[in-house]
Amino acid sequence: MRNIVKGILALLLSIVVTGAQMGQSQTIRDKNNSTIARIDSDGTVRNSSNSTIAHINSNGDIRDSSNRLLGTVSSDGTVRNSNNSYIGKIESDGTVRNRNNSYVGKVYQDGTVRNSNNSTIGYAKDVPVRYAAIYFFFDLI
């Protein structure tokens, strides 16, 4: 699940798509409300120790701190890994599906993130839905 956190980079593309504000960093929190990541306005994703773990460019490419491609997220929510293999979809309402089209969870408009058992696994208030979904549900790193 920690590797999924790094995948949050893909969510940065959604800021442009959704028109979210990027003036300051956006915070990802675990189920205990502890900060586990931040997304800077330039697309840099940092862990709770403030170390850079990933970056996403305007094309939706998700790259690690060494600039290696980890995956991509398209404007329609399609998520692909570094081999360009389809690994899932983030629907417009925040529903997340895996490569087999199985429901794995949802990111709600208030920022609450729940898994397929409807258990809260984290919070991403003011974070674009796609970014939160990538962070919590896709292992791109």
Give short role names for the model-derived ranges.
Residues 2-52, 58-60, 68-69, 75-141:
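Long terminal segments
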